[in-house]
Amino acid sequence: MTQITEKELKKKYLDLLSQNFDTPEKLATEIINLESILELPKGTEHFVSDLHGEYEAFQHVLRNGSGNVRAKINDIFKERLSTKELNDLTALVYYPEDKLKLIKSDFQNCGQLNVWYITTIEHLIELIKYCSSKYTRSKLRKALPKQYVYIIEELLYKSNEYQNKKSYYETLVNQVIELKQADDLIIGLAYSVQRLVVDHLHVVGDIYDRGPQPDKIMDTLINYHSLDIQWGNHDVLWVGAYAGSKVCLANLLRICARYDNLDIIEDAYGINLRPLLTLAEKYYDADNPAFKPKKRPDKHERLTQREESQITKIHQAIAMIQFKLEIPIIKRRPNFEMEERLVLEKVNYDTNEITVYGNTYPLKDTCFQTVNRDNPAELLPEEEEVMNKLLLSFQQSEKLRRHMSFLMRKGSLYLPYNGNLLIHGCIPVDENGEMESFEIDGHTYSGQELLDVFEYHVRKSFDEKENTDDLSTDLVWYLWTGKYSSLFGKRAMTTFERYFIADKASHKEEKNPYYHLREDVNMVRKMLSDFGLNPDEGRIINGHTPVKEINGEDPIKADGKMLVIDGGFSKAYQSTTGIAGYTLLYNSFGMQLVAHQQFNAKEKILSEGIDELSIKRVVDKELQRKKIRDTNIGKDLQAQIDILKMLMHDRYLD
């Protein structure tokens, strides 16, 4: 095979490129276009974290752009519309279908409704013009409803300088109304506003967990115009289960049972839990208090006694399977340093006690019926069969395949983006702030290199689903529970102790020193430098740990270098945080942190127009307005420009 020189490769590349730009005019037009785009203000980035399956609250934050929609409406209309009119317009943009029904029911005749249509279309066109003022016409066109692009563009770019087209514009709108297209046009315009106020979405981890509708969140994200995902520990647990890790699968089923969310498995993903229920009914009792499902905050109707009994039994069955499955992994991976988590081997089955970390505790609420005390790792044949069936069902679920593939395609363990570092959990460090080392396959890694190796193995496990006990699959589980995991961020997961030991001191999970060192500005600067980012300009944007604002905790740490945006979408955390989560906005003028009040119901917004927002705090104002050339996208565009200029000189100027 002949070796191609770099010069020949460059020539072939330019030959291919010249097929798209076969005249100097075409090439010049593209260069002019790209150079001009670099001078536009950077788009608004929207950061959300720790969604935990709370679809309704997440949907609302997306629809209101963390208050951005209302801010734009106020900018234009505050002096022209009453408070009620402002509220109605805001609710219409958030929930156009529902608000339209309410508004239309208030009108007595078609004439009044038609006047409202004309006024509302004018307001929405004006709003779109304002929201799109920093975009090219091409980018705006992509945000408009396809079936109405022509009409909307005519209305957007109309000129009142001359009267020649006055009746033309009036007829456009009147015909839309007469042909019964006004509702659909208004709905399309409302969604265009939602899209235009946020250029790019960052989901900083944990789409999955105890909330009831992570599948709906995934469907929403798949259809979102521009986003990235930094995996959370719960996301990786689901990826691991789909990739072939039975212990990850057992963990997520246990969590679903604990929080009465098994309908995610059965109804959302179509996975049959009947074999697991049959096993559970055979071996376990219904009256074990440690395994009764938690009450769901979003469920008004109580579980029937039969439903609670079934879930309690399933919960015990899958927990025991989980503890058994952990044993062989811990034994074949001594570098995981998890010998203390061989919990079933540490139980004294005669005295009903366990010795862990040098302390002996009596056990309560035990359910060791299926444990072979001579070989605690041994699964019963029925348990083995159930796990094989469940894994097969998981891997054959088309919807789950689509969701997990999207997580892999759009996700990563961390992301440097526009000078900031986005990471869900932590960067494992010791008490002195030095990066902790972890051995994988005979090599030692730390810091960014460790995270890169972890991510490589997540992707390898996902690509090789037929391998269920290889190193890569074991490492996905380690990311969920290991002490050097960037996602877990603690020294040990005390699941067993929480079920079976009354002494709460044994439940404590010691956090990685990262979580107190991140208050130190010099430490954060060092971490930014280690990841190749400018410590003077960059920040770390973090999720994973709920910010307890109710206790005075501040999400802005280390002189603004560290921003923690998990305030608790999860209803379960809201009593401890005092709020319903943080989100972050980063536009060309700077950063704003938004604290959200608990989202109760969209009905209140529809009827009263009052949004449960959101207190904004300015994190930072840019001294100079940031342009696209200052962003990741700008660097990509500049690289394209450099290549196009090379082609221009090679073909047309030399």
UniProtKB/Swiss-Prot annotation:
Pathway: Carbohydrate biosynthesis; gluconeogenesis. Its EC number is 3.1.3.11. Pfam families: FBPase_2 (PF06874). Keywords: Carbohydrate metabolism, Hydrolase, Manganese. Its cofactor is Mn(2+). Residues 288-307 are annotated as: Disordered. Belongs to the FBPase class 3 family. This is Fructose-1,6-bisphosphatase class 3. It comes from Staphylococcus aureus (strain NCTC 8325 / PS 47).
